[in-house]
């Protein structure tokens, strides 16, 4: 993918890594991706040609969500190590196929939950692990609502620079509509899944990490929400999901929109562009900890 994350990762590549190929189904984005490498990378519209190259050791998959599993499995089968953006996949079956492919072909696969790599996330984890807020019993995540398609537009011919069939890939074919891309694919269940699968993959990933719950899961899930009644986008607009965990007992809540806790340093908000629209509060039996955002930016409440 040659969108924001794709060429950002290419541009920030380590000095001991050569970006030899970039790929996107949109020729305009593809040109931008090539430019981000200083014109050194070879452009491709079809990722399968990238996987055929013997000089490619690893790939970064920053495509729409519905492509993640298929491209990860293909990369493993061709011996390429993988960094795949969150969310890792769209279904449990896809996730199992990805794990199986990585194990069978002895490939390293990393999922892009960038928030875990931030210094602030490390400090927040240590703060909780050292018992500074006591035993954590509840984590409440908040996020603004998913957009609704209140002004639908008719289907049309795809733009000349876009390979629409290849963009759809594993999805059922349908006519092109500008409400499908680029970033707005996230508001469709089959290709994005709404805010909970987009930003939730960041905020709740940190929660599972901090609570040492990566290799377990909830014993019950309760949800309520409001779904759209018009337009193409079908992800829930408002929603609240409550996950109950056992051994230890704790509750994880995802609320959109939820009760936002304003960031305490207003000057820093303006200076660094902190996005207050989504974050999490960790409630312990002695105190609480607020961790803002959860992906490229992670900030903890000063204590």
Residue ranges, per PLM feature:
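NAD(P)-dinucleotide binding in Rossmann-like oxidoreductases
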Residues: 231, 244-303
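N-terminal Rossmann-like NAD(P) cofactor-binding module of classical short-chain dehydrogenase/reductase
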Residues: 58-60
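Rossmann-like dinucleotide-binding domain that binds NAD(P)(H)
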Residues: 165-249, 260
């Amino acid at each position: 993918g040659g969108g924001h994350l794709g060429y950002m990762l290419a541009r920030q590549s380590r000095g001991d890594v050569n970006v030899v190929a970039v790929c996107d189904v949109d020729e305009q984005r593809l040109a931008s991706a090539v430019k981000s490498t200083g014109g050194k990378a070879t452009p491709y519209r079809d990722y399968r040609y990238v996987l055929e190259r013997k000089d490619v050791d690893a790939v970064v998959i920053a495509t729409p969500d519905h492509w993640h599993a298929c491209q990860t499995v293909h990369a493993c089968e061709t011996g390429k190590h993988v960094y795949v953006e969150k969310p890792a996949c769209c279904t449990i079956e896809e996730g199992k196929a990805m794990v199986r492919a990585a194990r069978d072909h002895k490939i390293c696969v990393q999922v892009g939950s960038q928030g875990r790599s931030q210094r602030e996330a490390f400090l927040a984890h240590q703060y909780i692990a050292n018992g500074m807020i006591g035993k954590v019993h509840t984590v409440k995540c908040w996020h603004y609502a998913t957009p609704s398609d209140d002004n639908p537009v008719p289907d049309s011919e795809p733009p000349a620079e876009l390979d629409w069939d290849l963009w759809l890939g594993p999805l059922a074919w349908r006519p092109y509509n500008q409400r499908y891309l680029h970033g707005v694919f996230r508001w469709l269940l089959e290709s994005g899944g709404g805010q909970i699968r987009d930003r939730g993959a960041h905020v709740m990933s940190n929660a599972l990490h901090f609570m040492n719950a990566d290799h377990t899961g909830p014993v019950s899930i309760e949800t309520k929400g409001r779904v759209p009644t018009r337009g193409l986008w079908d992800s829930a607009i408002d929603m609240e999901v409550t996950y109950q965990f056992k051994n230890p007992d704790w509750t994880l809540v995802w609320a959109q929109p939820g009760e936002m806790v304003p960031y305490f340093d207003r000057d820093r908000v303006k200076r660094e562009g902190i996005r207050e629209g989504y974050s999490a509060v960790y409630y312990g039996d002695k105190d609480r900890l607020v961790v803002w955002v959860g992906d490229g930016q992670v900030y903890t409440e000063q204590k």
